[in-house]
């Protein structure tokens, strides 16, 4: 009796969709080599069954923020941490880990690294060294994924040739196989639809509830709507940046929030671009559709689609498909090649989708930040069916911002501090951030209701008795404006702990965000006054020949910082995710080392890690 067919299990944990894309690509590449593969999210997998997967298991996990794991990974990870599992629980399992992260962050690919160690501790055997995809790589995470996959296939073949009966490098040609789209679109005759009066919230919930993937499963319906009441430029005309102060009021319902919370806004797409996309795809914007997973051998979703209320196609595109700003992923070009009728377009698309064309695709697509519409216009012979477009067009994602107001100081209002994103591509094309440029274009008198979701960020609201050391260069000052405003209100009726704040920007005269606010609180008797035990310290990096940053100012105030830490202060850091968080941490390590009598950096690092574990060192960084 012959040996049973080998299989590959690919488990992924994704927050933004990149890990899902990578996992599906691994699954597709395995099947093209004759190895059946199942691709499953960690939150849909029975973790207790993992020891029974004696064949190969590949884990694809992303790391977000400062070493945070995706929401879909948390329950899976808690299960693996159970002490009763023992060192031999996974002794039959062979595994490989591929991580997606950004080396600009201090805890680069932290989730993949800790998963790899835990699997090994539980007795599993690694197939190959873990792969670490890096957003900073010229080709993104795929720059690491391509050679890592090649090594994976060849190592599996060495372990057991049954994995690839024809060899690890023999693939079914791309032009001979095409997957079925995962989603099915039903078009409805308008005359058969019953008219329903729906609120904006219901329409958004309906559209995003049909949207592919698990990215929106817990937040299809907005928490509420906001209306802009103020749009103020904070930077001077001479500045190289455009930073705005926005104020909003609640529409119909009010949501309670705390300082340090984050609000996500769903931006509006340019209606003319949406119309052009729909026309380019040969679709009727007024048609009504329902969207649902395609039926498979093991499951039927027809009942789910029957219970859905149809939605207008244009509304669905506007609310769920980012056709105006996001660049398509590599798989989009592969599917395009199947539908190209012009031979030269087909060849170009196949090249872009191949490992050999990866760098050229990156230069054409990601570096230029080409939109879906621009790519489709560059290949006019391609006519992709709408079910494929629903699957492949990047989802329209809410954009997250740190709230810069306090509910105590600014009742029934939400304030945001937003840098308006704009850049020039290598081919000298001006590109703008979708959400920030849209917000900048709004006038307070416009009746635009913005759908929003509130949630906790990485900066927990501090009690008024907790001393604070705040570090917020640039727009990193946003959450701390709320912190200071709230503590100033609290101080009117009861004692509050002191606050030190370190702010930085390029130029004092052009980029000093909220200057009057900070300086008023730094005066005698103010929340940031040294007389109250606090302080306000500024670093203007370009105002002198030698650049000065917040970490330099922190070191200058070494004694006062240490005294406040000894009094139980918590450190809060917010701002750019590039070098700043690491440089600030290094400054605190120097202070701890110096003030404790010249101890080593390693001892200081452990001391600060203890602060992190007890919630006294918090970082919120963004790219």
From Swiss-Prot:
Residue ranges of domain FAD-binding FR-type in the record: 221-467
EC number of this enzyme: 1.18.1.-
Protein location: Cytoplasm; Nucleus
CDD domains reported for this sequence: CyPoR_like
A GO CC term attached to the entry: nucleus
Primary residence: cytoplasm
InterPro entries (UniProt xref): CysJ-like_FAD-binding (IPR003097), FAD-bd_FR_type (IPR017927), Flavdoxin-like (IPR001094), Flavodoxin/NO_synth (IPR008254), Flavoprot_Pyr_Nucl_cyt_Rdtase (IPR001709), Flavoprotein-like_sf (IPR029039), FNR_nucleotide-bd (IPR039261), NADPH_Cyt_P450_Rdtase_alpha (IPR023173)
Residues where NADP(+) binds: 475, 541-542, 547-551, 583
Distribution of this protein across tissues and organs: Widely expressed.
Annotated positions binding FMN: 14-19, 62-65, 135
Ranges for domain Flavodoxin-like: 8-153
Protein family: Belongs to the NADPH-dependent diflavin oxidoreductase NDOR1 family.
Protein name stated in the entry: NADPH-dependent diflavin oxidoreductase 1
